[in-house]
Amino acid sequence: EPNMDALIIPVTMEVPCDSRGQRMWWAFLASSMVTFFGGLFIILLWRTLKYLWTVCCHCGDKTKEAQKINNGSSQADGTLKPVDEKEEAVAAEVGWMTSVKDWAGVMISAQTLTGRVLVVLVFALSIGALVIYFIDSSNPIESCQNFYKDFTLQIDMAFNVFFLLYFGLRFIAANDNLWFWLEVNSVVDFFTVPPVFVSVYLNRSWLGLRFLRALRLIQFSEILQFLNILKTSNSIKLVNLLSIFISTWLTAAGFIHLVENSGDPWENFQNSQALTYWECVYLLMVTMSTVGYGDVYAKTTPGGLFIVFFILGGLAMFASYVPEIIEIIGNRKKYGGSYSAVSGRKHIVVCGHITLESVSHFLKDFLHKDRDDVNVEIVFLHNISPNLELEALFKRHFTQVEFYQGSVLNPHDLARVKIESADACLILANKYCDDPDAEDASNIMRVISIKNYHPKIRIITQMLQYHNKAHLLNIPSWNWKEGDDAICLAELRLGFIAQSCLAQGLSTMLANLFSIGSFIKIEEDTWHKYYLEGVSNEMYTEYLSSAFVGLSFPTVCELCFVKLKLLMIAIEYKSANRESRILINPGNHLKIQEGTSGFFIASDAKEVKRAFFYCKACHNDITDPKRIKKCGCKRLEDEQPSTLSPKKKQRNGGMRNSPSSSPKLMRHDPLLIPGNDQIDNMDSNVKKYDSTGMFHWCAPKEIEKVISTRSEAAMTVLSGHVVVCIFGHVSSALIGLRNLVMPLRASNFHYHELKHIVFVGSIEYLKREWETLHNFPKVSILPGTPLTRADLRAVNINLCDMCVILSANQNNIDDTSLQDKECILASLNIKSMQFDDSIGVLQANSQGFTPPGMDKSSPDNSPVHGMLRQPSITTGVNIPIITELVNDTNVQFLDQDDDDDPDTELYLTQPFACGTAFAVSVLDSLMSATYFNDNILTLIRTLVTGGATPELEALIAEENALRGGYSTPQTLANRDRCRVAQLALLDGPFADLGDGGCYGDLFCKALKTYNMLCFGIYRLRDAHLSTPSQCTKRYVITNPPYRFELVPTDLIFCLMQFDHNAGQSRASLSHSSHSSQSSSKKSSSVHSIPSTANRQNRPKSRESRDKQTEKKWFTDEPDNAYPRNIQIEPMSTHMANQINQYKSTSSLIPPIREVEDEC
């Protein structure tokens, strides 16, 4: 009876397949064996017959060939024999079979899209059949199943039908059918496909050898190579090892599961044991590892024999494969891999100097919440794996940031990050490196590598030294017209500082404009409240509505400010030949065209949309600017999409030039070309400007001619000048002082308006910089050290307009807190100095300027306008100073009376808000700003460099020096560009608005009357207090609202038009070219101390002293120089302290020209 029970298979009432319980496993196995051996017999029989046919017919073929040769002459007429027709038919048949075979080969080799789909589908279905086997392994080995009711059997049947078709394709494509029949994949099909058809016929299922489907895993690596997923040798090897190991393991477990659950046939299947498939997997693992716990073991004879042989092979495989797999995985780069581009999402590649500081600053600005539509993924590529802090930063931004380890100098790594499909590549520089030239060389090599791999990729790179920008022009595929940009940190940071010498606080305002800053609301009435309201403003660009077409720039600017609450400072103008240029406050001569885009200062990108949506018909009566939205009128803006915003790059296809990069666009008023008097007096043989007409120029001077000793400098009273205190030695890295001097020598200043520049520092260092400075006028050198007070007194630092403190030794110190020690010590040294007040009060160049026409003084007194200035400062605290810092946290040491927390961000500190401190880190925001709008960089460079153009850079790249040019109408036309100035409200035509007036009224009056565009206020820090304060510190307010109340001591930032007539009155004062050379010793900022009260004797005494000492400080004065008049007037010390040393210009502004009201 027990024997009978062992023979009975499970029988259900619905499916009475065998009432006797007879096993039918042999039928399933026989189907596979018959298929295999039957096919093998047919192949061998076919080959044998084919061989015999070939041997037998070999002699007959030779006889036919002989007959053909003998009868060839009789067929000279060209007719074909029937034999030829038969041969053509045979050839056609062979060709058809060959084409079918080739097609089948292509289908299984994944050379086409259909083939790749087929290969992947076969593998996927094989894994699916294996999963079905795993599911069925929980059932008995043999059971009754109805095909029409068993869902898994139906799926398995469908899979095997597909395998049968695929087997046919493989058979057709096989070059050798015998070897194909013996392949592993063929054997798998023989023992898995036929049993399924037998199952349908017998209505019963046998688990059998279906586990052989696991052997398909061996092809996993091959399929991944077909799909071009695996490319590296390590990845291919790793997948091969894993697939062979796992497939062998699963297949062996399937065999143990079959024999152990079936039992020995010769024992009448009585020694079977119920083991699940996963217990067999466990058994094989402990067997391979030779652990053998004994909890599970084989009881059947086939199982035991299999285990004996499996230990031999399995142990060898386990001992060799597992260590190799672990080694490959362990040595595999954590940040290897390749970037997978997401459809519909752009990505950029960031490389170069990748550190926690540089990446955090970049991500903070790039992913700022104000950029609400940034759909860009950031891919960092660096050859060093990130440390734990940087890795944590990447994980915090994992949705938008990925890191890959590699080098941009390796084309394979560039392919990994998909540089060819990247929207741009950004290269960061190490601002604190010891060797800036070496760092620039590294970045240039990165550019060369990237451009060599993909010439069309847009690159934005940081450069440290200005002279290294020239090397980028040597790269053939470098094209700034297509968006390639080089952000030169030396050029910009020194340009910002130079503009602060002309209008103190401007560096802070510009830095806040191109960086994204969140609005921080402060309720109490302090200077922080108004400063932070301005910090929330940024620079945006947007197309102008068609309602502005035909109006002049001042009219549109006023309308935007008054009605739309937007401040427009520049436009992108497209000339007739479609060349695009940025024009800053171009004046009333220019009319707005269709498709013109404007540059706006606003707090939100949504606000700027008002300029695009504005419709005169629909919005003319609206007073609330928030209600200005897209109306139903059919306008041109509806047809042309708005693409200019801070979040979208501007690609116009034209040239991105500075306002004066080309003289093609000229004023349409008679002031553009010099008057007849100027042309008559203009000596065409005298070079006063460089060849582009953008900067004042003089013949190269030897450095010995501009060097003065301390005693010689003390004999000359300098006033209204710029003192540059520089720390450096013979081996220090060059700062690039040319970038500081060039903005101060811009040609839109008249010669008498140029501030004299005095360098105080090591002569060994300045000799290295002199090659780039010897073409600029009004430059002097005092060898010494800025820490010596005697040197500072010798250059009259208490009478200067600005003291700049720079250091070339900042990056040679490992301790970051000590990097700025020299600059901080010099700043504190100056602030602690005391000065004598015995000279009196000098009415000289003022903090602001007063428009001409308000002062009817004589020509001799005409240069003297505006506010009164106290030159004899009693304490160094009131000296205007701007200090450059490397480490932002060191800003806390500059002001001893501030309450800034050491952890306060730089832009929130008092020294930065007051414009007395500048750090190169604020320029990091330019990378993001340039990517989203490449015209922003052009605008910033135009404002801070004084007019540097691509043409000028090409010239400097050629000669590394400015080339002198003759004064022609074309070069003089380039002088006609606006500049930044500060307008005083204490007196002059705007004095009535200074006492409680409205900023909006001042804006409109200045714009209509003088074409001056106001954009900010430089206000005393304690102006909001009801009680008077002795503090002379000021802070910056950017773009105040219309109703903002003014105070008399305010200084207004404005964009001032070039005055063509200011130079003519000066020329009328000049004498002959020989006699004027003597008077030229009296520059606009140099006053000698008289030995007597007789003022007429001063030029002669100075001339005689020059002959005796043979020291010529100013040998390059123009012929129209004039002696400066000094008037002594009493003045209250309190008022002087509030308004002194904040002078940006002493120029006369153009005559009053009323602007027509076009609104």
From Swiss-Prot:
One of its GO terms (molecular function) is actin binding. Residues 912-932 are annotated as: Segment S10. Residues 615-619 are annotated as: Heme-binding motif. It is a multi-pass membrane protein. Residues 1-24, 138-152, 199-202, 260-273, 297-305 are extracellular. Pfam families: BK_channel_a, Ion_trans, Slo-like_RCK, Slowpoke_C. It catalyses: K(+)(in) = K(+)(out). Residues 1100-1115 have a biased composition (Basic and acidic residues). The keyword Zinc-finger does not apply. A lipid is attached at C56, C57, C59 (S-palmitoyl cysteine). Residues 639-668, 1066-1124 are annotated as: Disordered. Residues 274-296 dip into the membrane without crossing it. The chain crosses the membrane at residues 25-45, 117-137, 153-173, 178-198, 203-223, 239-259, 306-326. Belongs to the potassium channel family. Calcium-activated (TC 1.A.1.3) subfamily. KCa1.1/KCNMA1 sub-subfamily. The protein was initially thought to contain two functionally distinct parts: The core channel (from the N-terminus to the S9 segment) that mediates the channel activity, and the cytoplasmic tail (from the S9 segment to the C-terminus) that mediates the calcium sensing. The situation is however more complex, since the core channel contains binding sites for Ca(2+) and Mg(2+). This is Calcium-activated potassium channel subunit alpha-1. It comes from Canis lupus familiaris (Dog).
